[in-house]
Amino acid sequence: MVFRRCFVASGLIVFFAFGCSGGANSSTENTTQVVQESNVTQLLIEAKTTQKAEDFFHQGNHLLDGQRYEDAIKAYDQAIAIKVESPEAWINRGIALTSLQRYKDALASYDRAIAIKPDKYEAWYNRGIALTSLQRYKDALASYDKAIAIKPDKYEALINRGIALTKLHRYQDAIASYDQAIAIKPDLHQVYYNKACSYALQSNLELAIENLDKAIELVPDKYKKLAKTDPDFSKVRSKRQFQELLQ
C-alpha cells in the first residue's frame, strides 16, 4: 500500500501597521507620544526577531526538500528557540524526524504543534503517519479522523486512513475511505491500488483485478512490479486472471 505525506510550506507572516499623530501641545500629549514611540520601537524589535525565526524556518524547509533531515532539524530548532509558539516549525521538525525514522520524537513534535494550535490539520495528519509507522493503527486512525474533521477535502488523509483501517482488518471501511478520496480526486492511482489490496485480502478476485487494472492503466510499470511481490495479493496471485493482468 502507498502512503501520502505533506509538510507545511507557509511562512510566519506578521503585519505591523504604524500610526502617529500630529504636533503635540500638552504634557499629556507628549507623554502619550513617548509611549507610542516606545511601543513602535518594541514592535520593530519583535518584527526583526520574527523575521529571523522565519528565515530559519524557510532554511529548514529548503533543507527538508533537499532530504538533509539532520540539518533541517537544526534549522527548525533555531526557529523554535526564537519563536517557540510556531506550530509550523514544530510540524516540519516532526516531518524531518519521521524521515529519519525517529517516530517517537516526531510524535512529541507534532503534539507540541497541536498544543499551540489544535486545529492545525497538518499536525494531526503527519501525526497519523508517525503512528502508522509505529504500527499504532487505532491511534493513527484517530489522528487521521481529526485531520479530516478539520479539512474534509484532505484526500491524503483519507488514503492513509484507509491503510490504517486495512491494517485493522476493517476492509469495507477502508474501501469506503478510499472511495471518499476518489470522489475528491478521481485520478488517484495509489487509491485504486490500495483498493485492489483490500479486495485481494478478502479473496475478492474480480474487484481486486478491476481496481488493480485502473492503477496499472494510470501508472503501468510501477503497479505491475509492485503487485508481483506485494503480500496483500497472496490470496489471488495464483489465479489465471491475475497473472494475465501482470503480463
Spans of model-derived segments:
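Canonical positions in the second alpha-helix
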Residues: 79, 112-113, 146-147, 180-181, ...
